[in-house]
Amino acid sequence: MGIPLGVDAPQHDVSSVDDVLALVRESGGRVTNSRRLLLEAIFDDPGHHSAENLAVLVQARAPDVHLSTIYRNLEELERLGVVVHSHLGHGPATYHLAASAHCHFVCEHCGSAVKAPDELFVSLADRAKKEFGFTIDTHHFSIFGRCRNCQ
């Protein structure tokens, strides 16, 4: 999972849409068509997606699903510890599976974002914990600079 998350949401070992739907049921939630389609979109392309992008993917299969429904479902999935959001620059928050916790390098010039290897931050996380009692939330940890192409 990488360096410590420092978030209160539980982390669940979910590897499929059906695993998440079982978790939703266990938590007393409803399994709706829009929730299933959203999960399929996330699992089909487990990268970073804005809520708007996910809405487009879901609406391609169910045009009546509104953006507000996507946001409500993402909020519930985040509460369950299935997805997390990250802020990669000045754009909207992006969502990805919680099991893929990682830090980001974000280019301030072109806006590109790449996954940063957790190993780069282990000593920082250890030191922050040891010296300050602070646990780094890797889902929200981005380092801004200039990418190779923009230098």
Predicted regions and their residues:
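A short acidic, leucine-rich amphipathic alpha-helix
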Residues: 53-59, 70
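Non-DNA-binding regulatory cores of transcription-related proteins
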Residues: 79-151
